[in-house]
Amino acid sequence: MERAMEQLNRLTRSLRRARTVELPEDNETAVYTLMPMVMADQHRSVSELLSNSKFDVNYAFGRVKRSLLHIAANCGSVECLVLLLKKGANPNYQDISGCTPLHLAARNGQKKCMSKLLEYSADVNICNNEGLTAIHWLAVNGRTELLHDLVQHVTDVDVEDAMGQTALHVACQNGHKTTVQCLLDSGADINRPNVSGATPLYFACSHGQRDTAQILLLRGAKYLPDKNGVTPLDLCVQGGYGQTCEVLIQYHPRLFQTIVQMTQNEDLRENMLRQVLQHLSQQSESQYLKILTGLAEVATTNGHKLLSLSSNYDAQMKSLLRIVRIFCHVFRIGPSSPSNGIDMGYNGNKTPRSQVFKPLELLWHSLDEWLVLIATELMKNKEDSTDITSILLKQKGQDQEAPSLSAFEPPGPGSYESLPPGPGDSKPEVLAGEQEASADCQDVISVTANRLSAVIQAFYMCCSCQMPPGMTSPRFIEFVCKHDEVLKCFVNRNPKIIFDHFHFLLECPELMSRFMHIIKAQPFKDRCEWFYEHLHSGQPDSDMVHRPVSENDILLVHRDSIFRSSCEIVSKANCAKLKQGIAVRFHGEEGMGQGVVREWFDILSNEIVNPDYALFTQSADGTTFQPNSNSYVNPDHLNYFRFAGQILGLALNHRQLVNIYFTRSFYKHILGIPVNYQDVASIDPEYAKNLQWILDNDISDLGLELTFSVETDVFGAMEEVPLKPGGGSILVTQNNKAEYVQLVTELRMTRAIQPQINAFLQGFHMFIPPSLIQLFDEYELELLLSGMPEIDVNDWIKNTEYTSGYEREDPVIQWFWEVVEDITQEERVLLLQFVTGSSRVPHGGFANIMGGSGLQNFTIAAVPYTPNLLPTSSTCINMLKLPEYPSKEILKDRLLVALHCGSYGYTMA
């Protein structure tokens, strides 16, 4: 009966308290009953359960083998912690990682728990498996108020963890100022190294902790490297911690020059160096000038090393350009930079800031001497039998004949002894062995071109940073004009110099024209790489489309009105952000990513030429489009043309192909290339033939009575439009007929659609600078925008006709098709463009190629062979005029020259 009553009482108490009133007999089950109560600090319930139980309060459970005392200390359950201690819980019991309850209380800042644990003799000197003590945990988290209490119980404040780090190390690393001061006041060793030799100052600098570094230095911390020779300054510069560098320099002024010299270290990230020097330069005017002067001196030294042929070209070139970039960056951020209009000295005024360039004048003088020397040797009389290379060989004491300079043949005797010396009387050197500049096999142009071009690039950068944005330095323009012939020799010998060092051409239209013919002769692939390198040069991520886009910058468009909604949202969007990254989402759809972006561009490229918008009309070939001169029927036509330009510019910027092809004349308008009468064939083939006829025949006695005016339909009424002022009274003659043809071409192809062209270019140039796009011709621009089409050679052969003596079985024809099969896909496209004016094969294959008067098969006509004669074409009738070459090798060579070097001998036969 008593037992039943006892069970009933237990049941009643359990129901009233909504918990068990007795612990299970086994510890494993009991501990999980107690744990939530301990975490909630329900000490009365815990006490009641423990009072009638044999539970072991030191029982370790779980994966990490902790006791309930660990749980109480970790959660700050101070009442339960005291209860457990009174019940005999071991305050120094370590879990599987070696942590005691005191460690956990210290890590989480449980002050009351720490105090009670210390009362019950918790050992503050116990280390966990990593060697960390409670004092380390307090230092890591900056628990200074607890540290004051704990250090009184610590026997060694410099106790080390497994890596030899003390509490002072970790406090300095985490920037806890008051903790650092407390540890130092408690006797911590300020210069104690860890196992790798790193001191507390080293740790503070590794994370840019300026304030803790200043406390250490103020208290006499030594500036010491680690065992690998890495110094605190190295760490500051690596992390870009300008403020911490400033503190180090305050206590160790000699480090200022060290930072300047660090610009030569290619292992240091350039942006971090810029960050540090930018901060230091903004502290005072004198320090700003001191930094710039130091950088100029280092650049000059590196430049002269680069001009020495015994140096490593690649390393010295990178070092010089890196230093000059940093120099220009620091110079621009000063209060008298070009951007804020304060005089920088480019008008001839010598200001303190412009004087920082003075050390560089030595380098520019040496550069000028080199170029003058080379120009002098190139101009010497051909009777002289000794070229520059021979002179270099004589300096080496060699008597063998030097190789000739085949590209220039610049003979001329003499010796460098008779030439004006450069700075420091240094003279060009040539070393034997495996030196880059071995005169045994290379002439002086080959040896020096890259080196001098790199210095020219540095010179341009320094000239530019002294000018307001958008202006080219008159001094640099004068320099290029002075040395024009030598620079062209460099480029002719090694065209890659343009892409490596002559970046100034893209920013100086007045200089670009001097080299454009050389640039356009370079491989299309190389120019594409140069184009995108400079297009994205000022942007944070070169992989533009894949750059993350914030939710606010997503283009949310409606699929059922994609053209109008896209036009509206793109017109309002931030152009800079669109250049950096683009993301599209269709309204009501969840999909995003590159697939959606590609779909968006693809749909828009079709919508742009949708007849409903009246923006473009289909040309005579049935596959290309031309701006519609009557687009004004759409009131928003100019806004839409601007949007079309934005879409094509965006697509090119993000390397997205568009499914749209324009007439050759429109590509010319985009590139700023003048149209010619052959372009008229795209919109009016018969009229183009008439213009060709005028040019090909003597019109003196034909009585055409043409004047420099034409009749045109203006809003339904015929009006006479003069081609030039007073054109209605100027007769077209044999002497001025070429001018007439050009002016009437411009009227049909340009003036009639000038507002549309201007609106389109306004949008296009928001994303693609005119200076960059001019790297390409109209054929290449089509490939950039619309990609490389696939060409079926068998279909091409099947649908080709032969005339003027050629037949399918002729050897020349067989050689031709063998060459077509051998060349690259890109070269096949160039051939197709060369003959038909288009890079595309229409739907249905070569059987559907259009000519000026309808369907016109690809045709090959025989031309009598003369040495060096190139193939020509008549695009209006898709005819290739192929000379009767004597061999396949000559045929291939001449054909590729015509394709790559622009032998576009178009006629309207």
UniProtKB/Swiss-Prot annotation:
Name the CDD domains on file.
Answer: HECTc
Q: Its Gene Ontology biological processes?
A: Golgi organization; membrane fusion; protein K48-linked ubiquitination; protein ubiquitination; regulation of cell migration; ubiquitin-dependent protein catabolic process
Indicate yes or no for the key word Transferase: yes
* Residue span of region N-terminal helix important for homodimerization: 1-21
Q: Which InterPro entries match?
A: Ankyrin_rpt, Ankyrin_rpt-contain_sf, E3_ubiq-protein_ligase, HECT_dom, Hect_E3_ubiquitin_ligase
Q: How is it modified after translation?
A: Autoubiquitinated.
Q: Name one GO cellular component term.
A: nuclear body
The pathway where this protein functions is: Protein modification; protein ubiquitination
Which controlled-vocabulary keywords does the entry list? Answer: ANK repeat, Cell cycle, Cytoplasm, Endoplasmic reticulum, Golgi apparatus, Membrane, Repeat, Transcription, Transcription regulation, Transferase, Ubl conjugation, Ubl conjugation pathway
Which top EC class applies here? transferase
How might one describe the regulation of this protein's activity?
Sterically autoinhibited in its dimeric state.
Classification via Gene3D superfamilies: Ankyrin repeat-containing domain (1.25.40.20), Hect, E3 ligase catalytic domain (3.30.2410.10), Hect, E3 ligase catalytic domains (3.90.1750.10)
Q: Where are the ANK repeats?
A: 23-55, 64-93, 97-126, 130-159, 163-192, 196-226, 228-253
Q: What is its main location?
A: Golgi
Q: Which residues form the active site?
A: 876
Compartments, record wording:
Golgi apparatus, Golgi stack membrane; Cytoplasm; Endoplasmic reticulum
Q: Deletion: any effect? A: Mice develop spontaneous, late-onset cancer. Moreover, tumor incidence in mice heterozygous for a p53/Tp53 mutation in higher in a Hace1-deficient background.
Q: Where are the transmembrane segments?
A: none
Disulfides per UniProt: none
| UniProt GO molecular function | small GTPase binding; ubiquitin-protein transferase activity
Written domain comment of the UniProt record: The N-terminal lobe of the HECT domain is important for interaction with E2 ubiquitin-conjugating enzymes. The ANK repeats ANK 3, ANK 4 and ANK 5 are important for recognizing the RAC1 substrate.
UniProt function note: E3 ubiquitin-protein ligase involved in Golgi membrane fusion and regulation of small GTPases. Acts as a regulator of Golgi membrane dynamics during the cell cycle: recruited to Golgi membrane by Rab proteins and regulates postmitotic Golgi membrane fusion. Acts by mediating ubiquitination during mitotic Golgi disassembly, ubiquitination serving as a signal for Golgi reassembly later, after cell division. Specifically binds GTP-bound RAC1, mediating ubiquitination and subsequent degradation of active RAC1, thereby playing a role in host defense against pathogens.
Q: How does it assemble?
A: Homodimer. The homodimer is autoinhibited and stabilized by its N-terminal helix. Interacts with RAB1 (RAB1A, RAB1B or RAB1C), RAB4 (RAB4A or RAB4B) and RAB11 (RAB11A or RAB11B); in a GTP-dependent manner. Interacts with the 26S proteasomal complex through the 20S core proteasomal subunit. Interacts with RARB.
Name of the protein this chain belongs to: E3 ubiquitin-protein ligase HACE1
Q: Which organism is it from?
A: Mus musculus (Mouse)
Gene behind this protein: Hace1
